[in-house]
């Protein structure tokens, strides 16, 4: 889907969405970006030079492109937050498993108060994030526009994911940086 000005004088209300075949004459698809994360979603340059598009390829009514793009952005914010919750849960699961197995002075490190505090903080952030994601998704399912809620959700949950994964690396110690252990990639 591409978004183009069909009525430049109308500002954002003059943008329309079109389905355009990537093999159409005048369309060039650039190389995929090698990103740090979100590799499931491809990021590429799309170049349009003198591309002719039939009116039947328009998505929705003329001038609705900006609204469609913003709806997609709201959805993507909530989905990014959902992915972050999954990453956090994996970080916690791996951390608990490791803390039960790893011994310091013949005692599993899970018995250390600081490790327990880190694990508890991780669990709190995960639960709060899940609640925020669920609330945002319920609003979306009800057809409510979630510009504010989607932004809050993505920001809060992403920040929590950074803290949770950092704590996981701390619990793993030097092994947290090793590719042999799963928290390195989180």
Descriptions of predicted regions:
Residues 8, 21-22, 53-54, 108, ...:
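Short, solvent-exposed coil/turn linker segments
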């Amino acid at each position: 889907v591409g978004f183009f000005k069909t009525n430049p004088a109308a500002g954002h209300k003059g943008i329309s969405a079109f389905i355009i075949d990537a093999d159409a004459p005048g369309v060039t698809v650039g190389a995929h970006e090698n990103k740090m994360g979100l590799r499931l979603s491809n990021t590429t340059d799309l170049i349009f030079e003198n591309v002719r598009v039939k009116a039947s390829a328009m998505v929705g009514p003329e001038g609705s492109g900006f609204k469609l793009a913003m709806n997609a952005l709201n959805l993507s914010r909530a989905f990014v937050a959902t992915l972050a919750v999954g990453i956090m849960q994996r970080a916690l699961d791996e951390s608990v498993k490791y803390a039960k197995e790893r011994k310091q002075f013949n005692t599993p490190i899970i018995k250390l108060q600081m490790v327990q505090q880190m694990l508890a903080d991780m669990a709190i952030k995960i639960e709060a994030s899940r609640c925020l994601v669920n609330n945002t998704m319920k609003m979306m399912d009800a057809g409510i526009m979630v510009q504010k809620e989607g932004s809050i959700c993505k920001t809060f949950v992403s920040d929590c994911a950074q803290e949770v994964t950092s704590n996981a690396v701390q619990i793993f110690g030097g092994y947290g940086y090793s590719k042999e252990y799963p928290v390195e990639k989180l």
